[in-house]
Amino acid sequence: MAILDVQHIEKHFGDTPVLKDISFSLEEGQALSIIGSSGSGKTTLLRCMNFLETPDNGVISVRGETLFDANDPDTKREADIRKKRLHFGMVFQSFNLFPQYTALENVTLARQLMAKTEKTGESMESILAEGKALLERMGLADRMENYPHQLSGGQQQRVAIARALAMKPDILYCDEPTSALDPELTGEVLKVIRGLALQHTTMIIGTHEMAFARDVADQVIFMDGGVIVEQGPARDVIDNPQQERTRHFLSRYSQQ
């Protein structure tokens, strides 16, 4: 059974259709890259799958449980939606760290709040220990007490990845995680994501890094104009695209 099943997702902003009948599934432990030009719908799709945007139509299921059905009001209650978001970790383009908190505090804050409000039984000590271990995995053992303004863009994005992983999500979403970085800092973030893929972390990554998508992702979806033009195994889609629109898009990158 697929860990994630997305069926017939549609989204409009006003009268403008942004997502048109999007359907796909993802197996546990796989990495899926979503590629496409700016404005193709990648970010909106990720936001709909994390309920930061509400789809106008469609069904989203995780592990066989229907989390959202546009035709079922019971799946759209805001209090329930907040809990359903815990299935997903989100890494944003622009880091979105809290400037008033250290790297370690950014990573552990949500878990600490949940332990208090939901009475999860977790101790503050265990949450801090896990947060430190995550930052060590990100190569930031010596930056735990630094504030965001004291970190490079690449370091901030690695903190953001650790923060998302700290909530132990079923699926990690990364929305163009290197787009706000200088070229020399891109590699350190891609290295971290590559390591997560090797550890079979279930991920969906919106990216403009074609070589990275080819080498790291198990599956690739190419979007254009709010529709899925082509999808399949990453190397098949990128090395031997079947659709003319996909070939045209990828040819621009091969010429760079």
Where are these regions (language model features)?
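ABC ATPase NBD coupling module
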Residues: L67-G89, M124-E125, V237-P241
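Short coil-to-helix segment of the ABC ATPase nucleotide-binding domain corresponding to the Q-loop/switch region
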Residues: Y101-A110
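Conserved ABC ATPase signature
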Residues: Y147-L151, Q155
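Catalytic Walker B motif of ABC-type/P-loop ATPase nucleotide-binding domains
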Residues: L172-D175
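A short, proline-enriched helix->beta-strand linker immediately N-terminal to the Walker B motif
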Residues: A166-D170
